[in-house]
């Protein structure tokens, strides 16, 4: 997750660490957790649940930020996507239990939620989402495959059981009645991510006839997203359609929307590509799966929880 690397550079925080021989000692772990102002849990789901249970009932000070999927739709935990809604940042600031979002979910929700809230995207829409991620998203086992020097795939799709672990939060926080059909893939690059959602105007959107007649749907979608993220520090809506491609740093070789252009940042970019004649649209979100999709989001939530500039230590 790169959380320690990001926090080690800070001079406003004191990091608490257990000696190697105490890291499986429950009493030592409990003491460290209860001594911390903020604890970030970078653990598998079951271990994160166990760690959260170590907080003493009388401890009303320690803030937990859980990077696992264990608590993301738990009503007793606050979803750690500050840009989710106008009041989400305040909810995070007031919470002692913050669930860090999943990387894929961050991109999908960033695209869908504003359009649902604006009354443009039907909550009943049966969406499809596809995504490509760097192999670091698979943790040490997958990193070992790609970096071990042996043969490996240049690209690989997965989750063909159609039950990816991010689906519950994708449905819940996009305010959809059903989760999308989600088709993720891993590429032969370490970091970076693009999440794409295609839309059919008449099937998925609630549009006034005059918008369809005038061919103004793309502008309407773009305006809704721009309004939602106005003033956001880390989320930006790029110029509409192919105009975004004219910015040389965004599209290399004139043809590719690269997933790795935001690596080592906490930024997320949104693109809107529509064909008014065909009445179709593709929304795309680009982010670093280890940045806004993981450690960057955790640090942003930590900053909000501590009441300091949410961008401290982030790019």
Kindly label every feature range from the protein language model.
Residues 267-315:
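NAD(P)-dependent Rossmann-like dehydrogenase/reductase catalytic/cofactor-binding core
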